[in-house]
Swiss-Prot record:
InterPro entries listed in its UniProt record: COMT-like, O_MeTrfase_dom, Plant_O-MeTrfase_dimerisation, SAM-dependent_MTases_sf, WH-like_DNA-bd_sf, WH_DNA-bd_sf
Residues bound to substrate: F137, D138, I139, S140, G141, P142, C143, T144, Q145, I146, L147, P148, D149, F150
GO terms classed as biological process: aflatoxin biosynthetic process; methylation
pH dependence: Optimum pH is 6.5-9.0.
Top-level taxon of the source organism: Eukaryota
Group of enzyme by EC: transferase
Name of the gene: aflO
Binding site for S-adenosyl-L-methionine: G228, G229, D253, N273, F274, R289
Keywords attached to this entry: Methyltransferase, S-adenosyl-L-methionine, Transferase
Reactions that this protein is recorded to catalyse: 6-demethylsterigmatocystin + S-adenosyl-L-methionine = sterigmatocystin + S-adenosyl-L-homocysteine + H(+)
Protein name listed in UniProt: Demethylsterigmatocystin 6-O-methyltransferase
EC number(s) stated in the UniProt entry for this protein: 2.1.1.109
Source organism of this protein record: Aspergillus parasiticus (strain ATCC 56775 / NRRL 5862 / SRRC 143 / SU-1)
Pathway noted in the entry: Mycotoxin biosynthesis; aflatoxin biosynthesis
Length: 386
């Protein structure tokens, strides 16, 4: 087979990938992973797998030194000498780092000691993607490293407490991660970037907002309370999708998070701890994205109990979370589930687990729609009819 034949095959795969749906994309990704393993020797498989932590570490080094941003912003390749001048790093050390980054595809080598951006470079030049890497490396990394020992010490029993999970052992602290984070502003900021990292699919494109509103909207009423909403990215998406929709949008989060939020037209920010009574009464939507997966069931029950008394007869709780299928769980969903377990004693839930959680507080799920290939879904909960 010639090089031209290979290019034709690759082009065909790219063409098929571009036109298929999310399920098809996931299947292609899976086939490519299987194909890679089939081409590797046992040594290759071990080395490839074991290189993962180093790749993440080199990504963080690239972020810390501003390498990715410099390469992305340059119209021409940049030499090692130029990067040394910008960073002040040792030429020999930086040369070894750059060539390894290039070997992993994090940057692209164009000649001897000369580099330009790759597709990965462009991703990590994005401030939200860079912040997400920092958060995952600094917080999730140490937890992942000691997970095997932690599980063995506990005789492989379930983790159900955010005060007794891998995080406490990894960081030598009696605090939960969310108690520890406000004492470390750098990590609060990187967590905000992780939350703000754009997903290619949004709930606003899949939930029938207008149909559900009916005659509810009015300029003086609260359309949505975005609880634990971070920088307000989901409220901003709703406002962008429906710019003329009347009603107030209120983003609630703790002060340390809101300190890094940027003002936005038509969006209000309010300091609020969701373990305290919900102060906004009779909103149409009480929206929570990626809140419940951070917490064991006991705390999730407390969060819901703060919202229910504030609900009016037309109110709905919108839960934007994964719904784990019984088989064929996407790697992104399975990965996130264990990250939540390690750091927070949290969990990505199945539909049965969601139903059980709602049952504990007298709610029922009246709608459920999975809207992307990672099993992200909108669950609509209301007080159970008697």
């Amino acid at each position: 087979m010639t090089g031209l034949d290979m290019e034709i095959i690759f082009a065909k795969i790219k063409e098929e990938y571009a036109r298929t749906d999310d399920v098809g994309k996931r299947q292609i990704q899976g086939h490519i992973r299987e194909l890679q393993v089939g081409f590797y020797s046992d040594w290759d498989v071990v080395m490839r797998l074991s290189s993962g932590p180093l790749q993440v570490a080199l990504t963080k080094v690239g972020i810390d030194l501003g390498i990715f941003r410099s390469l992305k912003e340059s119209d021409t390749p940049i030499t090692l000498a130029e990067i040394v001048k910008k960073t002040g790093a040792s030429p020999r050390l930086l040369g070894r780092i750059l060539r390894t980054q290039a070997a992993f595809g994090l940057i692209k080598e164009t000649g001897p000691q000369e580099y330009t951006s790759s597709a990965f470079t462009d991703v990590f030049a994005n401030s939200d993607a860079a912040g997400a890497v920092v958060q995952l490396f600094d917080i999730s990394g140490p937890c992942t490293q000691i997970l095997p020992d932690f599980l063995a010490e506990r005789n492989y029993q379930d983790i159900t407490s955010n005060k007794d999970c891998v995080f406490q052992k990894a960081f030598g602290s009696d605090l939960t991660m969310f108690e520890w984070m406000p004492q470390h502003p750098k990590h609060m900021e990187s967590l905000g970037h992780l939350m703000a990292l754009e997903r290619p699919v949004s709930w606003v494109d899949h939930y029938p907002v207008l149909e559900e509103l009916g005659g509810f909207p009015a300029p003086d009423k609260v359309l949505m309370v975005d609880i634990g909403g971070g920088f307000g990215q989901q409220s901003k998406a709703l406002r962008a999708k429906f710019p003329d929709l009347p009603g107030r949008l209120i983003v609630q989060d703790i002060p340390q998070t809101l300190a890094n939020a940027q003002p936005a037209a038509g969006i209000e920010f309010m300091e609020h701890n969701f373990f305290e009574p919900q102060p906004i009464q009779n909103a149409k939507f009480y929206y929570l994205r990626h809140v419940f997966h951070d917490w064991p069931d006991e705390q999730c029950v407390l969060i819901l109990k703060q919202i229910i008394p504030a609900m009016g007869p037309e109110s709905q709780i919108l839960i934007d979370e994964m719904v784990i299928p019984s088989t064929g769980v996407p790697w992104q969903a399975a990965f996130t589930d264990l990250l939540m377990m390690n750091s927070l004693g949290g969990v990505e839930r199945t539909r049965a687990e969601w139903d059980d959680l709602m049952e504990q507080v007298g709610l029922e799920i009246i709608q459920s729609k999975v809207y992307d290939s990672k099993e992200q879904a909108i669950l609509v909960a209301v007080p159970k009819r008697t």
